[in-house]
Amino acid sequence: MFPLNFHYEDVSRQDPLLNRITPTLWKFLGSCEIRVVPNGPYNFIIKNGKLAMEIPRGQKFIQTQRGSTGKSFRSNPFLGSNKDKGYVSDLARQSTLRGHGMSNFSVRISTVMSLLDFPVEIRKNSIQFSMETEFCEFAPQLQDHFEIFEHIRGFNVTIVTSANTQDETLPLWSGFLQKDEGETQ
């Protein structure tokens, strides 16, 4: 069974977020990008390279700037190099998923959101939630590289949509608020 069949048929009452094109091809409506930020101790630096979900997908990191210093990060975020010390914790950097990587991550999120107790907040044009590392059990591309994540508490995820208001966002993404047994948050 395709992973989204459960979400589409049993959980989200055919939520308008998902548009079934063929029995195995889905389109996520209104999503522009997914931003993922590891959540860990303030001074913790991941030394093993890229965020694991990006390893098989070749996604790019967004380089960020800090306040009035105007200094940008030029090294690989998550590599804990000395030239990054003193700016902002490496965990403050976000990873942005688009295209195929975003689609795969969306499939995993849609499949497990109804099973796990992640609080979800729908804002103007975004959906925000935090996931604990137990999410890795549902994402093989993460589980294969779990050593990177063994010291973090989870991920902060923001799904940016093309909506202009919260009223436009809510109907499409309401399935994220619905739990396995029909309960909503």
From Swiss-Prot:
Any one GO BP annotation for this protein: translation
Q: Where in the cell is it found?
A: Mitochondrion
Q: GO terms for molecular function, please?
A: structural constituent of ribosome
Q: Name one GO cellular component term.
A: ribonucleoprotein complex
> Main localization of the protein?
mitochondrion
Q: Which key words are in the record?
A: Mitochondrion, Ribonucleoprotein, Ribosomal protein
Q: Which InterPro entries match?
A: Ribosomal_uL5, Ribosomal_uL5_dom_sf
What family name appears in the similarity comment?
Answer: Belongs to the universal ribosomal protein uL5 family.
Q: State what protein this is by name.
A: Large ribosomal subunit protein uL5m
Organism of origin: Brassica napus
The uppermost taxa in this organism's lineage are: Eukaryota, Viridiplantae, Streptophyta, Embryophyta, Tracheophyta
Name of the gene encoding the protein in the UniProt record = RPL5
